[in-house]
């Protein structure tokens, strides 16, 4: 009877022994990481076999409780896990970094709401990520692009709705050098304009038409950080992002101003290299033009020393100014101020010479005026003389005839005249003439 009872409970004892051994092994100081996989599998098989051979126990009321045997439930061995550490639940992309992007964190970690204006960047579904860009994403800045160019169109031209021609917008290239940042910004602005975001971009002459939405700001930050890595940004861009890494608009505005400044620099250098002066304009105006160009270039970080500036100025001089004494004799130590001093002196000499010539020599207009006056004054005189000539000749003839008639007529008066030539002659006639002997 006892042997039969022992045989019935022998599997239980075996399981209990295995359980006790297993518990002892767990309680030892041995590192559980040292347990080999073969031992773990063997223990699992033994525990499974013991549980399968265990008979069905009757209800607690029929079978008396035996305090000398261990309970089968207490001998259950926990199932081994696949690894030494429990498997933890992994965080998905939306739950990772829910506070937003860190400074230049990976763009795929940022939760991105659907972008309403460009559906190609936001697949359907709430909290959806950016879709993968086409195969040409990741090209360098030197790769030719359909939108490449030195100028970008006005933002007002980008207000139209999406059409079949701009549904697939070509993304900008990846920035690879800080020196190419302004060229990259030109392409990036075209990319935003083709994405119907031209009205939120400021220009050199006016501010943005409207304020961007939160979705548009997210799209702006994502694309900027994706295509402009932080290690290739200029220092002034990093300074702006260190204050607010989402202030992309400030970067674009300052970039546009720098582009305009670069264009002005090119124009100033071109103007300086093509100067021309021959004295036809005042020397003050010429000096002001050149001085303003030199000051602008100096303020923009392009200083020009006196030697180079004087060479530009002397190359543009012509006429008498080309042979300035100072330029010929002391051009090595010449300054811009000294050169303009000589130009002013020569200009004043030319003006003084012109004033002196106008004083001593009458202008052709004055000569024409004098000739016209002489012709007009002589004609009336000739006409007057011709009109008075017959009257004068007739009166003189009449007077001579009267005198001759009076002399030839006989009378006592005539005898007195013939008889005495020394005495004063007194003529008594109708004209009452008195003649002296010396004048007869």
Swiss-Prot record:
Compositional bias segments (type: Basic and acidic residues): 363-372
Main localization category: cytoplasm
Triggers of expression: Ty1-BL is a highly expressed element. Induced under amino acid starvation conditions by GCN4.
Annotated compartments: Cytoplasm
Superkingdom to which the source organism belongs: Eukaryota
Site (Cleavage): 401-402
Stretch list, region Disordered: 20-84, 137-173, 350-424
Keyword RNA-binding appears in the UniProt entry: yes
One cellular-component annotation, GO: cytoplasm
Biased composition annotated in UniProt, kind: Polar residues: 20-31, 46-55, 137-168, 373-411
Example GO BP: viral translational frameshifting
Chain spans, region RNA-binding: 299-401
Keyword Ubl conjugation: no
InterPro entries: TYA (IPR015820)
Signal peptide range: none
Keyword entries, A-Z: Cytoplasm, RNA-binding, Transposable element
Subunit structure: Homotrimer.
Function of the protein: Capsid protein (CA) is the structural component of the virus-like particle (VLP), forming the shell that encapsulates the retrotransposons dimeric RNA genome. The particles are assembled from trimer-clustered units and there are holes in the capsid shells that allow for the diffusion of macromolecules. CA also has nucleocapsid-like chaperone activity, promoting primer tRNA(i)-Met annealing to the multipartite primer-binding site (PBS), dimerization of Ty1 RNA and initiation of reverse transcription.
Domain notes: The C-terminal RNA-binding region of CA is sufficient for all its nucleocapsid-like chaperone activities.
Additional detail: Retrotransposons are mobile genetic entities that are able to replicate via an RNA intermediate and a reverse transcription step. In contrast to retroviruses, retrotransposons are non-infectious, lack an envelope and remain intracellular. Ty1 retrotransposons belong to the copia elements (pseudoviridae).
Entry protein name: Transposon Ty1-BL Gag polyprotein
Taxon lineage: Eukaryota, Fungi, Dikarya, Ascomycota, Saccharomycotina
Gene designation per UniProt: TY1A-BL
